[in-house]
Amino acid sequence: MRQIVLSLLVCLGLSACGPRGLVRSEFAGRSNEGPKKVLVVPADFVITEVTFGKTEERVVPAERQASNTLSKHVLALGQKQSAFTVVDFAKLSKPHQEVLLQHRALFATMVSQLLLVKEDAVDVWETKQQYFDYSLGRGMAEVSTQTGAETAIFIVGKDKVRSTSRKVLDTFASVLPIGESLSAQPAAVAVGIVDLRSGDILMFDNEMATRKALTDDADVQAMGEAVLTDFRDTLKSREGGKTGGAK
């Protein structure tokens, strides 16, 4: 976990994190010194199952499994590193947990717009790619004061899976024009790195995969790792002596 988070935060000292992610503009050119304490908020996944009759239902056990799988995988990736302390979300007071979960929900509502900025999908947001300045507000400042954590990581995801009967229908749909198939529906994971004191979103990135599902542990691990790949690559480049210029 520490290696991944450090590599994410090292990007604050660079002019960019490669072609995938968005970095808050005012941090470009800043020192690459990372925070001493980082708080990782449990991932929030929304998984719905589509039946033969096209009704949709939330699959809560699958959502919890995906969240637990990702958390364990991310922690395993950073076990050998000790650059800074990871604050255990489970040990926070209930009021502080609720505050963080509320801000995670707020982040989730912003993802669609952040994607438009990242993909340069709407001309009016072209400036936002260069001057990225979204914020969740100062509602988490007390959590930072009480825990000493400077930064939080929010991860959200969404997927549609098929019931057995729906899979049978989609098998026929692949060879006969009898209806819309869900086989091409992409699973999606998005990550936000947030300053706890100001609420500023420091970085944002996402991963979408058509042939992966959040109900598959290996796929969850792969998507969670993919969404952080560019940031880890940036750390490796910095360690190799490469530096990025400020905008």
Language model features with spans:
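N-terminal segment of the mature soluble domain
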Residues: G53-K158, D200, F204-N206
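Sec-dependent bacterial lipoprotein signal peptides
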Residues: M1-S15
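C-terminal/domain-edge helix-coil "capping" segments
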Residues: C17-V50, T69, L136-T151, V156-K247
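Homeobox/homeodomain signature
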Residues: I4-S7, A28, K36, Q97, ...
